[in-house]
Swiss-Prot record:
Gene name linked to the record: aldA
Protein EC: 1.2.1.22, 1.2.1.21
UniProt site (Important for substrate specificity): 286
GO CC annotation: cytosol; protein-containing complex
Entry keyword set: NAD, Oxidoreductase
Record-annotated active site: 251, 285
Activity response to pH changes: Optimum pH is 10.
Thermal characteristics: Optimum temperature is 40 degrees Celsius.
GO molecular function list: glycolaldehyde dehydrogenase (NAD+) activity; identical protein binding; lactaldehyde dehydrogenase (NAD+) activity; succinate-semialdehyde dehydrogenase (NAD+) activity
Native organism taxonomy: Bacteria, Pseudomonadati, Pseudomonadota, Gammaproteobacteria, Enterobacterales
Top EC class, one word: oxidoreductase
Protein name: Lactaldehyde dehydrogenase
Family: Belongs to the aldehyde dehydrogenase family.
Pathway: Carbohydrate degradation; L-fucose degradation; Carbohydrate degradation; L-rhamnose degradation
Outcome after substituting residue 180 to T: Can bind and use NADP(+) as coenzyme. 16-fold increase in catalytic efficiency with NAD(+) as coenzyme
Amino acid sequence: MSVPVQHPMYIDGQFVTWRGDAWIDVVNPATEAVISRIPDGQAEDARKAIDAAERAQPEWEALPAIERASWLRKISAGIRERASEISALIVEEGGKIQQLAEVEVAFTADYIDYMAEWARRYEGEIIQSDRPGENILLFKRALGVTTGILPWNFPFFLIARKMAPALLTGNTIVIKPSEFTPNNAIAFAKIVDEIGLPRGVFNLVLGRGETVGQELAGNPKVAMVSMTGSVSAGEKIMATAAKNITKVCLELGGKAPAIVMDDADLELAVKAIVDSRVINSGQVCNCAERVYVQKGIYDQFVNRLGEAMQAVQFGNPAERNDIAMGPLINAAALERVEQKVARAVEEGARVAFGGKAVEGKGYYYPPTLLLDVRQEMSIMHEETFGPVLPVVAFDTLEDAISMANDSDYGLTSSIYTQNLNVAMKAIKGLKFGETYINRENFEAMQGFHAGWRKSGIGGADGKHGLHEYLQTQVVYLQS
């Protein structure tokens, strides 16, 4: 039996062999086989990476933005050259279907190129002064050392979402991938190394959140920590960062409502909602997690929704190309989804189909539809993060908006209607960072991905995401 490959970290421009004894197994969720091992890194490793980033930052910031952008384009070119290799890694370690892995890799390269285009576009200001002969200048300056703590559901793209705006604006960065999906990050570091990016500008530290992650949030040399993950993890990062008043950018959980009005295009609504729920086996924070259907079309919609959900094929993505879903990420995730559904049934919900984990190897949970659901049930409030759709009927738009807003989360929402007035009322009434009208829940790189309430602080993408990595310096110049 072959020994799984043991990965190094990438610190200060070189791959660093782990000298410790503790390793973390990386498991293929489709087969439960160990596919690699990574160092169980410690705070000391994170400190070394932060120190390297601090040393590199002044010289990196001194480069013209257009030169920093040229380095980003070299990275994106390297990604495209290795696209097949990287997508295979994502399939293997994350259980993602092949088509989605390929999209993630291509989108990552495009995203880096998009951010590089901002090199000539982000600007300061000249402000009118009240004093004769004075000029007030507002400069946009880099923060310094930034850190990025990644999730496992879109692990490769999240490297770019944090790294690209950070580097373009003159910051350096230390990245910690999830211990469940680190192999693609190693491939990213190899590209960075091969293109010769200046030492210390990009660093990769491996390990767990409670050790490496806490140091990345709590080290006083860090100017900002950007973290994507659960609310509980975000709370810990925020508390640790608060000790140094370190800026945080947090993208956390979601419980996205989808509202279907009685005038909706049902074929479109069913397809968009099913696509939003089964993508990545339901493990996407911004996709529909609860559905509100107007009573006049409830039976018709539920029948169509059930047919579409039952038609979803799932299996091992390394073996099948005709599937829409792979497994959940690990045994703990599978158990959580099982518990959420079991509790819903205890509270009175009815499982129309699905509802039980698949026996055998792999962490598979089938598409599941829950009916006879009431708003007060836990399944309508707690993030499921699996291919489960609970459906509730409503009378009026006001009722639907009220139930949609009855949530600790505020990331995304959606509504399906052919009435522009209804859509506009929903837009004004829904208290979410994003609202989708007659389409699936998936953001654009030039938009702004930001949640309200417990879904996060700050945001990513577009002009506003770029500015998360900048701070202002105002100069009063008297002549």
